């Protein structure tokens, strides 16, 4: 089924220019939304808790900052861009008591709405505007007169104005310059979680670590294994990002292409596909979200344990040593401090 696409001519910027927008959070997406909306002539304020390290940064960039409760009371459009696991408590404590008839509650990701962790009053418009790129790219493209494709969705529309408002907001951050796709909270949430877990984060990470283990256990130097299964991954992903799988196969050697065709299906086979379906089923049923919430309620103990085990994998030790040789690689603070 073809998706609905919208561009600049389909969106009326004056709609969002006539509203007061509170952006909750000032991370990657929060700063991009706020600055771009401001530059589009929108009245914007940032909601950050007292003591947040981001307060000074936002103020230095000329933005008005208040607590989430203060800016929610002032605004009639509230964009929630805080971390998923913090959104429900922020909504309950700071946003919900200040909601008024005619307000709109927007999100950059649908998890909390789709899985009923947040239930907005019936008189509030509930929507989503989600650029398909990191905040620094959203902001850079906007400044350059371009845009990053975005998704919009409407979950609750008491006044029948939700889509026009979402498109106007998307135009304010440059999304309609590239193209905006209409979706649903269900589709965005479930596809996003599946991509992260089965392919982008979980699947890729385990593939890399297992490949490293196989090579080291076979007697190859850890440094050689690291280069072959992790370091060179960026070269392949960049080619796929720029032109798809066909571009990647065109660009690599015939030896690599032929070997990939033969061996790829031996690694990712029908059994793997069935396990991926099971992951999707856990997402669709809400099982993953229940476990995510339980982890937060238990003080992040499960997540911290998984992080610790991951950090102790031999590939991390080898990688840090090799990255010391790479002057062109931007080093994370944890490795340079």
UniProtKB/Swiss-Prot annotation:
Signal peptide: none annotated. One of its GO terms (cellular component) is cytosol. Pathway: Amino-acid biosynthesis; L-isoleucine biosynthesis; L-isoleucine from 2-oxobutanoate: step 2/4; Amino-acid biosynthesis; L-valine biosynthesis; L-valine from pyruvate: step 2/4. The active site is at residue 109. Mg(2+) 2 binds at residues 192, 228, 232. It is an enzyme of class 1 (oxidoreductase). Transmembrane segments: none annotated. It catalyses: (2R)-2,3-dihydroxy-3-methylbutanoate + NADP(+) = (2S)-2-acetolactate + NADPH + H(+); (2R,3R)-2,3-dihydroxy-3-methylpentanoate + NADP(+) = (S)-2-ethyl-2-hydroxy-3-oxobutanoate + NADPH + H(+). GO terms for molecular function: ketol-acid reductoisomerase activity; magnesium ion binding; NADP binding. Residues 184-329 form the KARI C-terminal knotted domain. Keywords: Amino-acid biosynthesis, Branched-chain amino acid biosynthesis, Magnesium, Metal-binding, NADP, Oxidoreductase. Binds 2 magnesium ions per subunit. It holds the Pfam family KARI_C. This is Ketol-acid reductoisomerase (NADP(+)). It comes from Rhodococcus erythropolis (strain PR4 / NBRC 100887).
